[in-house]
Amino acid sequence: TTEIYTLSLHDALPISGPLNKGLYGKALSKKIWDLKVINIRDSAEDKHKTVDDTPFGGGNGMLLKPDVLAKSIDQNINIGERIFYLSPKGKKFDQKIAKDLVKEKYINLICGHFEGIDERILSTRNIEEISIGDFILSGGETAAFVMIDSILRLLPGVIGNEMSKKDESFENSLLEYPQYTKPLIWDKKSVPDVLLSGDHAKIKDWRLSQSEAITRDRR
C-alpha cells in the first residue's frame, strides 16, 4: 500500500472528493493506496492553537511557526521518509518526479498557508520544496491534490499502463527569498543578522541576492 500523508490546517483535504471515486476509489478500496490528513494545529500547545507568526525583517503576511510544524512532522512521519513542502519557489514537479515517487511507500506532503514557512524547518527535517507551477494558490491543498492525482495514476493496478506526458514552460522570474519567524533561535539555528539590523536597504539587498541565487539554482 502506498501511504500518502498530507499535513494541513484542515481535518480533511478539501478537494479529496474525486480521489474517493472512480478508478481511484476502487484502488482505495483494494488498499493499493491510502490517504491520511494530519491537522498541524493539533501540534500547537497554546490555548489558541497558534500556528503562525510575523516574519523577522518585516513584510506582509504570516509564516507557519517552525516549532509547531516540526512537532507535527516528528509525531507523524518516520525519519528517512521523503517530505515535500508545496511552495511556489520549489523545484518544478513533473512526470519524471511523479514516476520516481511511485517507488516510495510513504509520500508526505506539507500544504502551505499564509506567506510560507520558517526557512530553518526545511533543513532540519530534510524537507524538499516542490512547486506545481509559477502561480499562487490560497493554500497548498490544491497543489497536493495535483501531485496525488499524478502519482496515483502511475501506481500498478490503478489505471493499467495508461500514462500522460505534460511539457510546460513558465516565465522567468525571481523566486522568493528565505523567511524566518519566532523563535529567534530554534534548533540551535539563528535568524540571519541582517534581518535583525533594522537597515531596510541592507535587508532589501540581502533578499534580492538570496532570490537571485535560489532562482539560478532552481530554474
How does the language model describe each region?
Residues 14-74, 196, 200-217:
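N-terminal nucleotide/polyanion-binding subdomain common to many enzyme families
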Residues 60-63, 92, 114, 118, ...:
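Gly/Ser/Thr-rich beta-alpha loop segments that engage phosphate groups in nucleotides
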